[in-house]
């Protein structure tokens, strides 16, 4: 073999090794990400025409009233079949004035490519498997602002949502008076159309929440840049309550929001629910109709809850003598 041939062969081998070490970008994934970047910009810019140029536009009208501080997509996977594709996507958004960090939810998008210009467009956008719906997945979102609250409703009148805002605005000062430790002193309330719609937001069967007037969802542990907790109302059960009961429910759930930063995996349910009940009924002249789950016999059913201290149980970390909120989602039954 001549010297020039050896040199050429070595250069070929080097180039092959170098190429093998590179990760080639998926052009379809890159194109889909570009479409979704334009879609996100249209949402934040309230530009329906620009949104429609990226594909199906019905959802734009559903969420147009929601006060958004951030909205973005991240494509995690694309499965292409000819001129169609299915994309796994993370949607991240923040509600202005309430979310310190983004809500992150998984979505499944179906797209198609125009044969004329080769551009991809969104045909459908739905929650991924085992992910809950967002309010705008269920229809047009109406928004009512209170002094200490933001109420988002679907299938509800503005008058009804104003009633929820008024209740929440009374709940926040009542909770702050009982729980003086730092919290945002504002709440987000979601009011869907029905029990089934509530279950859709939570990504769970409706049977799990039948008879539950409301639940509060949020991250445990008090992460600094976390999304705001959501109080999610079951309108079917909530509508059966009287004036006092409705106020107690919102105050009870707001207590969970306020105490969220002190939540740990060791928090007993009776402790978090007992304190929330105490705050809910505190100024009503009434006592809760029944004790929370696993309420200890040694604890009084009236008076200040601090007269009943949690005890340490064998094999578990000590429970707090402050009164933290429950983990994830806990509801107030009718």
Regions found by a protein language model. Give the residues of each.
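Short solvent-exposed beta->alpha transition segments
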Residues: 24-33, 37-84
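Short beta-strand edge/turn micro-motifs at domain boundaries
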Residues: 97-141
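Sec-exported extracytoplasmic/periplasmic mature domains
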Residues: 37-44, 56, 169-184, 255-264, ...
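Extracytoplasmic
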Residues: 82-84, 104-106, 117, 138, ...
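Juxtacatalytic substrate-recognition/specificity segment
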Residues: 145-268
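Secretory targeting and sorting signals
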Residues: 1-22
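Surface-exposed, charged secondary-structure patches
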Residues: 62-106, 235-239
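Acidic/His/Gly-enriched intrinsically disordered linker/tail segments
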Residues: 218-224, 244-245, 263-333
């Amino acid at each position: 073999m001549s010297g020039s041939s050896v040199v050429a062969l070595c250069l070929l081998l080097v180039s092959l090794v170098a190429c093998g070490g590179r990760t080639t970008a998926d052009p379809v994934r890159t194109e889909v990400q570009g479409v979704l970047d334009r879609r996100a910009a249209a949402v934040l810019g309230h530009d329906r025409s620009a949104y429609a140029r990226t594909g199906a536009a019905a959802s734009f009208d559903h969420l147009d009233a929601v006060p958004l501080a951030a909205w973005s997509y991240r494509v995690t996977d694309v499965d292409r079949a000819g001129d169609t594709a299915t994309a796994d996507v993370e949607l991240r958004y923040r509600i202005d004035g309430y979310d310190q960090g983004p809500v992150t939810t998984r979505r499944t998008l179906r797209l198609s490519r125009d044969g004329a210009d080769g551009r991809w467009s969104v045909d459908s956008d739905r929650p991924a498997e085992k992910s809950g719906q967002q309010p705008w997945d269920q229809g047009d979102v109406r928004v009512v602002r209170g002094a200490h609250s933001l109420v988002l409703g679907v299938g509800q009148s503005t008058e009804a949502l104003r009633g929820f805002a008024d209740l929440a605005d009374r709940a926040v000062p009542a909770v702050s008076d009982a729980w003086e430790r730092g919290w945002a002193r504002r709440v987000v309330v979601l009011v869907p159309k029905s029990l089934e719609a509530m279950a859709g937001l939570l990504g769970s069967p409706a049977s799990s929440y039948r008879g539950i007037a409301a639940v509060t969802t949020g991250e445990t542990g008090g992460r600094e840049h976390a999304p705001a907790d959501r109080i999610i109302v079951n309108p079917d059960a909530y509508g059966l309550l009287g004036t006092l009961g409705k106020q107690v429910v919102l105050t009870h759930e707001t207590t969970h929001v306020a105490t969220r930063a002190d939540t740990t995996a060791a928090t007993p349910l009776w402790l978090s629910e007992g304190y929330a009940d105490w705050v809910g009924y505190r100024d009503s002249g009434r006592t809760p109709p029944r004790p929370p789950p696993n309420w200890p016999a040694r604890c009084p059913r009236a008076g200040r809850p601090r007269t009943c201290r949690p005890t340490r149980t064998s094999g578990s970390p000590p429970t707090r003598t402050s009164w933290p909120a429950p983990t994830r989602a806990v509801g107030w039954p009718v």
